[in-house]
Amino acid sequence: MEVAPLMAEILRKNQVKATFFAANERTQTGDGSLGTHWADWWKARAAEGHEFASHTWDHTYWRSDVVGGPGVAPQFRVSPSAGPSEGREFIWTAQQYCEEVGRASARLQAITGKKPLPLFRAPGGKTSPRLLAAAKACGYQHVGWSPAGFLGDELSSDRYPNAFLLKKALRDIQPGDILLAHLGIWSRKDPWSPAVLEPLIVGLKSRGFCFQTLREHPQYKAWIEAQVSRTPAKLAK
């Protein structure tokens, strides 16, 4: 979250609305990205018209399916990368996974007063058809990103300098692509956002691009509209 204020200012300055997928991850300042320290930051983004969705509560990675015999409901081997169970492995039912997704969504709504979109992004984009079906059954459709939309802010700055990433994105991004960037990557020595985000937005706009949230994306719009009057099942209390 260390570059979150700068990213928010760049988005505001350039009149760009984004969809933030949030998990309660460790931060260099405060009590986690969905803790009280950052609550006002999230509230301000809601007031600006941004959208929100779940990235799971403890940034929990799917590792594999655990498939039983006939008639046995699928389970999932998972590993949280934040929170008190960081680094451990568990076998979860579909209901437990839904609760993990729903907990982040519920916290975002409690902080911002705005209902998050009925979407989620699995950490690392790691899923299986069974996991996607389980999440969809409790009201959440998965959102990945476009190949050209992987902006590279989590890659090594030695191998992938900012100038290279900017040039590649401006060359390859196509209409309808979903772009992926983070609110801070500790491991990258040369921070991406201060050097790339605004030139990327300006450059794409000069090519005739506009920016919208996932609420307006044709791949997800019908799903969101169908779910808007429903409360996703299995939310954590």
Indicate residue ranges for each PLM-predicted region:
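Active-site beta->alpha N-cap acidic-glycine motif
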Residues: 1-92, 96, 100-118, 192
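C-terminal domain-boundary segment and adjacent tail
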Residues: 14, 18, 189-237
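Structural recognition of the beta-strand scaffold that forms the well-ordered cores
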Residues: 18-22, 51-56, 118-122, 141-146, ...
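Short low-complexity, flexible loop/linker segments enriched in glycine and/or proline
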Residues: 34-37, 67-70, 157-160, 225-231
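Charged helix-capping and loop-helix junction motifs
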Residues: 34-38, 161-165, 193-197
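His/Asp/Glu-enriched short active-site or ligand-binding loop at hydrolase and phosphoryl-transfer sites
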Residues: 126-172, 209-220
